[in-house]
Amino acid sequence: MSVSTVGGDVRVTRWVATIAGLIGFVLSVATPLLPVVQTTATLNWPQGGQLNSVTAPLISLTPVDLTATVPCSLVRDLPPGGGVILSTGPKKGKDAALNALFVVAHGKRVDVTDRNVVIASASRDQVAGAGCSRIEIASTRAGTFATFVGLTDPAGKPLGGGFPDPNLRPQIVGVFTDLTGPAPAGLKLSATIDTRFSTTPTTLKLAAMVTAILATIVALVALWRLDQLDGHRMRRLIPANWRTFTLADVAVIFGFVLWHVIGANSSDDGYILGMARVADRAGYMSNYFRWFGSPEDPFGWYYNLLALMTHVSDASLWMRLPDLFAGIVCWLLLSREVLPRLGPAVAASRPANWAAGMVLLTAWMPFDNGLRPEPIIALGSLVTYVLIERSMRYSRLTPAALAVITAAFTLGVQPTGLIAVAALVAGGRPILRILVRRHRVVGTWPLVAPMLAAGTVILTVVFADQTLATVLEATRIRTAIGPSQAWYTENLRYYYLILPTVDGSLSRRFGFLITALCLFTAVFIMLRRKRIPGVARGPAWRLMGVIFGTMFFLMFTPTKWVHHFGLFAAVGAAMAALTTVLVSPAVLGWSRNRMAFLAALLFMMALCFATTNGWWYVSSYGVPFNSTMPKIGGITVSTVFFSMFVAAALYAIWLHFASREHGEGRLARALTAAPVPLAAGFMALVFIASMVAGIVRQYPTYSNAWDNLREFSGGCGLADDVLVEPDSNVGYMTPLGGDYGPLGPLGGQHPVGFSPNGVPEHTVAEAIRITPNQPGTDYDWDAPTKLSAPGINGSTVPLPYGLDAARVPLAGSYTTGAQQQSRLTSAWYRLPAPDDGHPLVVVTAAGKIAGNSVLHHHTDGQTVVLEYGRPGPGGDIVPAGRLVPYDLYGEQPKAWRNLRFARSDMPADTVAVRVVAEDLSLTPEDWIAVTPPRVPEMRSLQEYVGSTQPVLMDWAVGLAFPCQQPMLHVNGVTEIPKFRITPDYTAKKMDTDTWEDGTNGGLLGITDLLLRAHVMSTYLSHDWGRDWGSLRRFETIADAHPAQLDLGTATRTGWWSPGPIRIKP
């Protein structure tokens, strides 16, 4: 080939790189502004020509706008007492008047109220008169107004009113009325449902996105061709060292696979799985637990991958495969690319390789084994670092362009993807030097244009089905509602790490602190020594720059969660390998320095063990010390390591003053040979042993590993092990004959201090009532305080769990007058023969009761025990022993709960049981109340709820219940759930209730207004003392059927917006 031909090819390639790069860049940047097709939805009422109520719960809670027209003739036809003409929420819903719009006729007046504000009001006689033709109502961004057309006020102006406040737009869960019969002419309500996020790309936008992606690829290929002009060949795509496997490879990969099966999950797995399962029906990736159903964009492409995976299965093992893949690839990149790049001393060091592998595992285990994006970010940051280093090593720009792409996509996963940007910044100056050197040969634009296209092509993914306006609105909502914390509150992230909670647990502390220790040690040594044989200073400093840069960038992320530390897993492992070499005898010749590092490492271990061995939610089941500090023989492990730290520190001080003429001793060399891989390996064994112990202690009931293994045979997670009483009135035992007192068999012969109404007012199931009601406080807002008809033993106290007072008696010791010691011994109740389907005896009780539980261990209180008896002479029952109950809610004295007594704890020849209750305290708060014992009829939650009924699964529980059907939403309207599944009481109160509250745009804003929730009796099979959570059955407040929406389509530009969603209370 001639020189002119080569020159011509270069010119063509330069033009291709420039033009394709600019096309890719321009089209990518234009993508957010290009038009989309919106699915429009309108709620019109009445429907079917009849006056009936319909439901249409809006995921955004409020509409874009609402108009209504009510003929005044309807008021004339109402009974004298009046009624609801129309409303957007059922009148008996929780805080209905505070949230919804009502048009109500009273005996004397007709009022239009919206969110507890009287918009307009007129006397009923005026409205019913001939002068009034209709009531017109409009609620838009401009405000809410109503007019009685035909009527005038004393000033002669049209009678009406209103307020120019966009926050008065009412919540809509449907349209409800007290009217019946055919719909009269002129009655109409029309609401524009907010479906701004339900969009698909137009043909123009789709073509632009495809062209942008193709142009970027062409530009990168052209850039690669220009890279060849230096005449040097890059190493092969798959180098030789990738083809060999070592013992460390086997150990690390086996560790990843083993942890994938038996290991703990991350905190937001249920949250993310819930979004992924709902996305297909919704048409976009909505954050439907909060924030008014707004999309996750611009940080959501990884969740869309998970949504695609749900089409195959929702099982945990399948859904978490991307994280397993990311972990294994991280290790392969570390061992084959990163460690050799850090220098021959690091690559050749077996301790360094093991340090990298063990630190990667121990950082991965607490943070990166779930559905959260940290493992993908860890992989993306490592790939970016590898590509930057390869670009510098070979003076090529194509790897740098690919690094820009990986950094952009890593940032597109979550704001914490800034770690990949930190990798770009760390390598920025060397890359700029390469760019300056190469532009003299091929020019500037052929090099810059592909880079621009590479950095912006992510926009075609982020804005594939959303627009700039919708993403800005979603960002506004998340920022306004929060959490959205300022940069100067970054200290909270580290503060949470030292608290004795799951966020500050043993595993999470080690996962981050080992990285921090290695980082600061390496910085100190590298600053002290200008040259270290076998260590490449440039890559080493850039690695440290990545970590420091990430710590800086994390300040600007809106949330300060500890789980974000999972993104350090890969770079932290590389830092551990580098530090292992830096603190080796080959570099630190004086054993004093190495012993000082060992002392620091032991101090870090003591700090790690100075907390609980806690894991998130169900992952902690059966794990030793999951709520206390680990101990050995009564001595905390933290104390052991702290003692070792003191010894090592004293030894280091002694070495400082001892003579160095005789060299270092064998003890010092042995202790300081490889402390990092040994410490990390020890911690990996601790974590694995914790999970294995949990499996053994929990079997045959639920544990993470057992659940994962059952998935191969179609298991349904926790739903297979949670037992539900469909009807708690079933299973009550027959009392044996005898003479009873005024309380009947429950009170026995001589009850003292107990009465049928001895319970405080408004005592509800499994809940605390605090006045005034606090956010996160669980209370039954609609529970009656007194029955209209007395129960079987004269009690008027409402019973929990659906218990029928006409069949179930009650006896309580509460009184407001003079206090006395109260005692009760019930009649003997005949116990059925034992079988596997009836493992429990249950007593529904309330008050301050002594009992045992997994969480609280033993709780002191008054006595409620179950006494069991054997057959005696003459047919009498002879007491044979007593059982203290499993009481899950012992710290909630004002709560009904089910006290559990395991049949397996009773002798095989037990034939009868009775309740023995004693309230010996004279303090009014120390009351107790009991009902008769029963042997409950139970079914698994999977059998009872099934996989087709819509369920509101709190964000914490989703991964544990993969077979239940989440409540879906489409075209801006949600399904109406039949049940709610919550986590344990503490998590429900502090986490899910507050996060999903309607004030924050959560799903509870819908269910609270539209439904009533009733707690059901549930138990975790063979783990009777554990609070797994709760199942709540929803009951509709109003008789209504789902509304039919009027759907359509509209083409919208990228900057079109129907206005801000109402997010203020």
UniProtKB/Swiss-Prot annotation:
> What keywords appear on the UniProt entry?
Antibiotic resistance, Cell membrane, Cell wall biogenesis/degradation, Glycosyltransferase, Membrane, Transferase, Transmembrane, Transmembrane helix
Please name the taxonomic classification of the source.
Bacteria, Bacillati, Actinomycetota, Actinomycetes, Mycobacteriales
One GO cellular component assignment for this chain's record is: plasma membrane
Q: Name one GO biological process term.
A: response to antibiotic
What family does the Swiss-Prot or TrEMBL record give for this protein?
Belongs to the emb family.
For the keyword Chloroplast, the answer is no
Coding gene? embB
Topology term for the membrane: Multi-pass membrane protein
What the entry lists under Gene3D superfamilies is as follows: 3.40.190.160, arabinofuranosyltransferase like domain (2.60.120.610), EmbC, C-terminal domain, subdomain 2 (2.60.120.940)
What this protein is called in its record is: Probable arabinosyltransferase B
Q: What does this protein do?
A: Arabinosyl transferase responsible for the polymerization of arabinose into the arabinan of arabinogalactan.
Please indicate if the UniProt record lists Disulfide bond as a keyword. no
Cellular localisation: Cell membrane
Q: What class of enzyme is it?
A: transferase
Species in which this protein is naturally found: Mycobacterium avium
Bilayer-crossing regions: 15-37, 204-226, 241-263, 394-413, 417-436, 441-463, 510-527, 540-557, 567-589, 596-618, 633-655, 667-689
